[in-house]
């Protein structure tokens, strides 16, 4: 599985067209994604969310607003439609074009929080809105959708002359801040949803299915009816695992849906997989280790610790070097050049059977240079404001052709080799120590194999020096492979990888 995160608002934006649209995902774009080796497209920012035109600026981050401050779970964001009255039809058409090309479609599901000014225009008439039937006079009730600070008004951390925002009583903020006075670093533009846990004492009230559970099941069923193939679940770990056990079971009775959890607590991995998630973010182990190796000169041998720490869950982890939350590889805040990320990307693509994700513009070395509104100059493509990606502009793509070809060759290689798609993994680092004719400081070697294919993969993380190494294949591996040479000489150029059939 190769996922392409496509942030619709930014993907089709240009210097003259401030906001991209669903219609920008045209036949030519779809063809390019297929040729790139993509299997799934994660359409980001499609659900209606806060923006400066429709919501109070005091509870809106940036001009375009955060795509994770949802104002209507049942609507498409009008910004990304060429004909706003036909926005759902435009979404359905985009999904149809992707499906016609054999691509699967993933969208965000944001279950932990919603925008302070949430009001559904498009929900089923029979269903009460979130908070509509709440008792706002109590801090917690399992029948409420929100948490409240009874008798206390909301005090926002920002102000603007002549602009006022009134909320009484104050609701808890999305990042579990149960206070009427969230800080500027809190998710003050959002409200925490109540799944039946009283955070004052941690008690769980699940004997009767909480109202929020039922509302969220209906939201998911609605988008399944629009033929989406999966959900990337925002901050899944902030919603109780008991809900996921219940809702995913209900969903999968009717749909073959893929569920991907954004999760950052390794001790919770297995319970969320047991609850029905198909894949989990591998930020804490994989991404953080590779970032540390690049920034601080850590040894490539540390990569072994990644899969060991997962205790057999390696193939369930979604690997990435970029997404909307992370600093761009090519940014001066990180690697400074997309090419410096090539060996790290090769590892992400080839190490396991699990899914791989790239972020729009990554395949052209997008740098995200300069300040962009709310998020400032942080090396990320802003999710809060109207920006465009220079590298993705047609007139500039030729300048980044070598980067694009690297990604295309890597992703198509991943998809076309059974040993990579579904084969087993054997780490060779234990058999190639420091004192041998090997360099575990900069070189990582492993085998991917299946019945009909055996591949030795050697990656050189040194960006300056050629590595001429002798890779020992231990007797144990030779037996697993059904016989092969006990040693291979491999020469790998700086920042590259080499695949040897053995």
Model-derived regions: residue spans:
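N-terminal structural segment of carbohydrate-active enzymes
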Residues: 1-104, 112-114, 119-123, 127-135, ...
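Active-site-proximal helices and loops of the catalytic beta/alpha 8
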Residues: 148, 154, 218-317, 365-413, ...
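Hydrophobic faces of well-ordered beta-strands that scaffold small-molecule active sites
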Residues: 2-4, 41-43, 105-107, 231, ...
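Aromatic- and acidic-residue-enriched segments that line the glycan-binding/catalytic groove
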Residues: 51-70, 111-185, 274-282, 371-383
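Glycan-processing catalytic domains of CAZymes
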Residues: 22-37, 47, 56, 63, ...
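The substrate-binding groove and active-site-proximal loops of carbohydrate-active enzymes
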Residues: 7-23, 69-88, 189-212, 229-238, ...
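Carbohydrate-binding surface patches
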Residues: 432-474
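C-terminal beta-strand-rich structural cap/linker in extracellular carbohydrate-active enzymes
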Residues: 486-502
């Amino acid at each position: 599985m190769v996922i392409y995160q496509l942030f619709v608002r930014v993907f089709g934006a240009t210097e003259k067209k401030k906001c991209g649209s669903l219609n920008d995902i045209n036949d030519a774009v779809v063809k390019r994604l297929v040729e790139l080796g993509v299997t799934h497209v994660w359409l980001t920012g499609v659900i209606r969310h806060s923006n400066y035109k429709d919501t109070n600026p005091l509870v809106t981050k940036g001009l375009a607003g955060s795509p994770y401050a949802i104002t209507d779970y049942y609507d498409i964001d009008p910004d990304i439609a060429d004909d706003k009255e036909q926005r759902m039809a435009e979404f359905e058409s985009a999904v149809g074009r992707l499906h016609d090309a054999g691509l699967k479609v993933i969208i965000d599901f944001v279950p932990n929080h919603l925008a302070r000014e949430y009001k559904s225009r498009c929900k089923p008439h029979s269903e009460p809105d979130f908070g509509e039937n709440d008792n706002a006079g109590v801090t917690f009730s399992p029948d409420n959708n929100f948490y409240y600070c009874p008798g206390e008004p909301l005090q926002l951390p920002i102000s603007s002359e002549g602009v006022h925002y009134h909320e009484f009583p104050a609701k808890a903020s999305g990042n579990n801040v149960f206070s009427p006075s969230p800080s500027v670093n809190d998710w003050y533009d959002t409200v925490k949803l109540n799944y039946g846990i009283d955070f004052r004492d941690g008690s769980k009230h699940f004997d009767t299915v909480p109202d929020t559970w039922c509302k969220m099941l209906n939201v998911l069923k609605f988008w399944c009816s629009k033929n989406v193939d999966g959900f990337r679940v925002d901050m899944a770990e902030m919603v109780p695992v008991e809900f996921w056990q219940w809702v995913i079971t209900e969903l999968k009775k009717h749909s073959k849906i893929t569920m991907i959890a954004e999760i950052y607590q390794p001790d919770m991995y297995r319970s969320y997989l047991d609850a029905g998630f198909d894949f989990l973010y591998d930020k804490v182990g994989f991404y953080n280790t590779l970032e540390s190796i690049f920034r601080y000169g850590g040894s490539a041998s540390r990569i072994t610790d990644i899969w060991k720490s997962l205790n057999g869950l390696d193939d369930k982890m979604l690997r990435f070097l970029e997404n909307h939350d992370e600093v761009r590889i090519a940014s001066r805040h990180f690697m400074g050049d997309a090419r410096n990320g090539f060996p790290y990307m090769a590892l992400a693509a080839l190490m396991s059977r699990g899914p791989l994700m790239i972020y729009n513009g990554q395949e052209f070395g997008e740098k995200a240079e300069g300040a962009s509104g709310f998020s400032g100059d942080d090396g990320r493509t802003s999710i809060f404001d109207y920006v465009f990606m220079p590298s993705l502009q047609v007139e500039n793509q030729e300048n980044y052709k070598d980067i694009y070809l690297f990604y295309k060759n890597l992703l198509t290689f991943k998809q076309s080799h059974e040993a990579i798609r579904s084969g087993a993994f054997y780490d060779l680092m234990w058999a190639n120590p420091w004192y041998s004719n090997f360099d575990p400081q900069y070189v990582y070697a492993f085998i991917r194999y299946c019945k009909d294919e055996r591949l030795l993969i050697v990656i050189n993380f040194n960006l300056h020096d050629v590595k001429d190494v002798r890779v020992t294949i231990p007797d144990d591996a030779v037996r697993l492979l059904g016989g092969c040479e006990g040693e291979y000489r491999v020469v790998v150029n700086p920042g590259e990888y080499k695949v040897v059939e053995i």
